[in-house]
Amino acid sequence: MFRYELIGTDGGARRGVFHTPRGPVRTPGFMPVGTLGTVKGLTIDQVAATGADMILGNTYHLRLRPGHETVAALGGLHKMCGWDGPILTDSGGFQVFSLGAINKVNEHAATFRSHIDGAKIELTPEHSIEIQQALGSDVAMVLDHVIALPAPMTQVEDALARSIRWAARCRIAADREDQALFAIVQGGLDRTLRQQCASELAAMSFEGYAVGGLSVGEPPEDMYTTTGFTTPHLPADKPRYLMGVGTPRDLLENIARGIDLFDCVMPTRNGRNALAFTDEGPLKLRNAVHKLDTRPLMEDCPCLACRHSRGYLRHLFVAGEMLGPILLSHHNLMYYGRLMQATRDAIEAGEFEAFKNAKLAGWGHEPFQETV
């Protein structure tokens, strides 16, 4: 029912298709984040127009609002939000990290205080799977223990061991044949721990494998290095997903190291704050230099924003018009979607390295090389 088809490789980069009951997911691919069943500011049709094959929903937030039972009563996440393609739901594990001041973690569960009303919520691996099954996502994630980096080795080892045990509990609890389950590799920035975790999780036969616990405070170069020594220990016949990443540079550097799937709020969050991604690098449209600029953000971009001038887009933000965040969110997701399509084409043509280096140069970056 779920199958990863590897079409070709170019160096470490992989071109493939993740086949799901609701349609194929082309890889490398980027998943727009619809935390509460909506990609902020955009309609489902607008999201689809950016080239996305799969979107992401958030288990923790949907558990609180409107509640997973409510989502199920409304026909599941797909019917509720109107998305016909595949949906991936995260497990709530990242909230253990991001809302750490109001959470506690022990072997049994992560205990939350709702950021909405302060209600106590106990999230066990089994309850995380129960919620994701009620939501009806196509891909569920195991519950893991995320920590900030850098961290003491004892803390990294403890979170790693707990994540492996929780993954095993999720594997037992996940009994829907129409829902894939992805494991999450932890281990901080330590090569030995990452490889140990990858090997132990690979033995549990998940439908896909995520690299988690990165983009949590470490320098980008440490992320790239860690991805590079982790992916060789993951099954080649399963999709590889780097969670919560990232900038256009992050995407290309990690694709070079064997990653297939990404998600991040960066395109839409930055779009709501007047920052547009382009081949010239990011443009901050509130800057006065754009006031009289008649050019579009990009000449060849088919998004809604690029029908207008940079000066008009700046005006929308300065005036506080809601159209500004909508247009830039659409542009940024379109930019990410087109970047992924161009990347897939470059891999198939055997030109990925040259493509990556040209893009990085346009953004003002040098290719990253690990030190031996």
Swiss-Prot record:
<comment type="function">
    <text>Catalyzes the base-exchange of a guanine (G) residue with the queuine precursor 7-aminomethyl-7-deazaguanine (PreQ1) at position 34 (anticodon wobble position) in tRNAs with GU(N) anticodons (tRNA-Asp, -Asn, -His and -Tyr). Catalysis occurs through a double-displacement mechanism. The nucleophile active site attacks the C1' of nucleotide 34 to detach the guanine base from the RNA, forming a covalent enzyme-RNA intermediate. The proton acceptor active site deprotonates the incoming PreQ1, allowing a nucleophilic attack on the C1' of the ribose to form the product.</text>
</comment>
<dbReference type="GO" id="GO:0005829">
    <property type="term" value="C:cytosol"/>
</dbReference>
<feature type="binding site">
    <location>
        <begin position="90"/>
        <end position="94"/>
    </location>
    <ligand>
        <name>substrate</name>
    </ligand>
</feature>
<comment type="similarity">
    <text>Belongs to the queuine tRNA-ribosyltransferase family.</text>
</comment>
<feature type="binding site">
    <location>
        <position position="303"/>
    </location>
    <ligand>
        <name>Zn(2+)</name>
    </ligand>
</feature>
<feature type="binding site">
    <location>
        <position position="186"/>
    </location>
    <ligand>
        <name>substrate</name>
    </ligand>
</feature>
<feature type="region of interest" description="RNA binding; important for wobble base 34 recognition">
    <location>
        <begin position="268"/>
        <end position="272"/>
    </location>
</feature>
<feature type="region of interest" description="RNA binding">
    <location>
        <begin position="244"/>
        <end position="250"/>
    </location>
</feature>
<dbReference type="GO" id="GO:0002099">
    <property type="term" value="P:tRNA wobble guanine modification"/>
</dbReference>
<dbReference type="InterPro" id="IPR036511">
    <property type="entry name" value="TGT-like_sf"/>
</dbReference>
<dbReference type="InterPro" id="IPR004803">
    <property type="entry name" value="TGT"/>
</dbReference>
<keyword id="KW-0862">Zinc</keyword>
<comment type="pathway">
    <text>tRNA modification; tRNA-queuosine biosynthesis.</text>
</comment>
<keyword id="KW-0479">Metal-binding</keyword>
<keyword id="KW-0671">Queuosine biosynthesis</keyword>
<feature type="binding site">
    <location>
        <position position="301"/>
    </location>
    <ligand>
        <name>Zn(2+)</name>
    </ligand>
</feature>
<dbReference type="GO" id="GO:0008479">
    <property type="term" value="F:tRNA-guanosine(34) queuine transglycosylase activity"/>
</dbReference>
<feature type="active site" description="Proton acceptor">
    <location>
        <position position="90"/>
    </location>
</feature>
<dbReference type="Pfam" id="PF01702">
    <property type="entry name" value="TGT"/>
</dbReference>
<dbReference type="GO" id="GO:0005737">
    <property type="term" value="C:cytoplasm"/>
</dbReference>
<feature type="binding site">
    <location>
        <position position="144"/>
    </location>
    <ligand>
        <name>substrate</name>
    </ligand>
</feature>
<keyword id="KW-0808">Transferase</keyword>
<feature type="binding site">
    <location>
        <position position="213"/>
    </location>
    <ligand>
        <name>substrate</name>
    </ligand>
</feature>
<dbReference type="GO" id="GO:0101030">
    <property type="term" value="P:tRNA-guanine transglycosylation"/>
</dbReference>
<feature type="binding site">
    <location>
        <position position="331"/>
    </location>
    <ligand>
        <name>Zn(2+)</name>
    </ligand>
</feature>
<keyword id="KW-0328">Glycosyltransferase</keyword>
<comment type="subunit">
    <text>Homodimer. Within each dimer, one monomer is responsible for RNA recognition and catalysis, while the other monomer binds to the replacement base PreQ1.</text>
</comment>
<dbReference type="GO" id="GO:0008616">
    <property type="term" value="P:queuosine biosynthetic process"/>
</dbReference>
<feature type="active site" description="Nucleophile">
    <location>
        <position position="263"/>
    </location>
</feature>
<dbReference type="InterPro" id="IPR050076">
    <property type="entry name" value="ArchSynthase1/Queuine_TRR"/>
</dbReference>
<keyword id="KW-0819">tRNA processing</keyword>
<protein>
    <recommendedName>
        <fullName>Queuine tRNA-ribosyltransferase</fullName>
        <ecNumber>2.4.2.29</ecNumber>
    </recommendedName>
</protein>
<dbReference type="InterPro" id="IPR002616">
    <property type="entry name" value="tRNA_ribo_trans-like"/>
</dbReference>
<feature type="binding site">
    <location>
        <position position="306"/>
    </location>
    <ligand>
        <name>Zn(2+)</name>
    </ligand>
</feature>
<dbReference type="GO" id="GO:0046872">
    <property type="term" value="F:metal ion binding"/>
</dbReference>
